[in-house]
Regions:
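P-loop NTP-binding core
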Residues: 1-260
Length: 260
């Protein structure tokens, strides 16, 4: 399978974006895919979520400025077939620095070329910053599709409408003519509440088959796992959160195979 690049993105924080990037990456690796997690969020929560410490100079920052090769920034994790390009605080300056450069929206795409050409990974998941700044737009420009986590709350659909506008602009300007939403996953679902069920129904009515069947539940174990530097499948495999992300990985795999 040629390398597929998927950006995990939502400009609203606290919707399960990084949780989804980390756990989907781990669950795809667990079904024998070679996965690279590219952490572009300066908060570096995906980096610590797979057990790596924040290390000065470890991020993709200098590569995005045109210095070096992204392959040299890839670090192994304790989890088989899962590798990571870490993030750290220097990425905070990326939006300002990239804005001054030529082809400033294509820097991540250019950085990923040697990764794609190497054939080393079947899937690259990008954990985007919780914003629609230049770094996130770079991730969009480099991606084959977007995976959008939506929290089961009242304002869930606001995020997707803004995302659609940005997608349209990137397609129309030729930055990424084929970019589309790969899938939408509902997160923090609480089946006991009327609101959660109503929001899921509303999103499914609006977005149809783009919405994954799997919903990610609210889960204490899911919330605990990052503090131990482990994806949920390696922290508590028999939890509801692990079961949900394993099912999501199967759905993602089906879509990837169909898209070939």
């Amino acid at each position: 399978m040629p390398t597929k690049v998927i950006a995990v993105a939502n400009q609203k924080g606290g919707v399960g974006k990084t949780t989804t990037a980390v756990n989907l990456a781990a669950c795809l690796a667990a079904v024998d895919l070679r996965v690279l997690l590219l952490d572009l969020d300066p908060q570096a929560n995906a980096t610590s979520g797979v057990g790596l410490e924040k290390t000065e100079g470890a991020s993709a920052y200098r590569i995005l400025l045109g210095e070096g090769n992204l392959l040299d920034k890839i670090k192994p994790t304790a989890f088989e077939r899962l590798e990571v390009v870490p993030s750290e605080v220097d990425l905070c300056a990326a939006d300002l620095e990239l804005a001054r450069l030529d082809n400033h929206l294509l820097r991540v795409a250019e950085a990923l070329k040697p990764v794609r050409d190497s054939g080393r990974f079947e899937v690259v998941l990008i954990d985007c910053p919780p914003s629609l700044g230049i770094l996130t737009l770079n991730a969009f420009a480099a991606s084959d599709g977007l995976l959008v986590p939506l929290q089961c709350e009242y304002y869930a659909l606001e995020g997707i409408s803004m995302m659609n506008r940005i997608l349209g602009q990137l397609r129309e300007t030729g930055v990424n003519p084929r970019l589309d939403i790969f899938g939408v996953v509902m997160t923090m679902f609480d089946g006991r509440t009327k609101l959660s069920n109503e929001v899921v129904g509303e999103v499914r009515n609006l977005l149809g088959a783009r919405v994954f069947e799997t919903v990610i539940p609210r889960s204490t174990r899911l919330a605990e796992a990052p503090s131990f530097g482990k994806p949920i499948i390696h922290y508590d495999k028999y939890s509801s959160g692990s079961a949900a992300y394993e099912l999501l990985a199967q759905e993602v795999l089906q879509r990837l195979e169909t898209a070939q």
